Amino acid sequence: CFEAPTKGLLQELLAGKAEVSYDKLGSVVFTNASADENAPKIMLASHMDEIGFMVKHITKEGFLKFVCLGGWWEQVMLGQRITVHGSKGDLVGVIGSKPPHILTPEERTKVVQKRDMYIDIGVKDEKEARKFGVFEGCPVTPYAEMAVMADGKTLLGKAWDNRIGWAVMAGVLGG
C-alpha cells in the first residue's frame, strides 16, 4: 500500500521508454537496453518506501492503537493528520492521546509515549471502524500536501529522501 502509488506513477512515466520487471520482494526494475551490446551497463538504485504506521488494535471505543514503521519521534506525532488505508478506501484521522485537562501535573511535564497514543478516525466504536474497512494490520501514512515555501524555491513534502532517487532515475530513462 505504501509504495503502490509511486510504482504506478513511475510505470506511467516510463511506459514505452523502459522494460519493466519485478522481483519476489516487490522491487521494480526498469531496463533500458542499448542497441550497442558493448555499451557499458550502469545501475541506478533507489528506494521508494516511506515511514508510516500499522493498526495494531481497534479499541471498543473505535480508537486505533498502532505501531510505528520507521523512525518517529514522539515529540512530533500528536496532532499529526494521517490517512488510514482501509479495505473500503482511505480515511482521514489524527493522532491523539489523553487530553491535557485530565493529565496529572507530573504527566504534563513529560512527552507522551507512543504506546499512549491512538488514531482517532471519528467513529463511535470498534464495530463502526470495521464497517469503514479498518482492520488489524491496516496501513497508515502521514498526510502531507506538497507546498512551495516562502523563498519560492524550497519545497515541503514527505518521503523526499526516498523518492528523489526515483525522480532522478525517471529523468535519466527519459520519463
Where are these regions (language model features)?
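N-terminal hydrophobic/helix-forming segments and targeting peptides
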Residues: 1-175
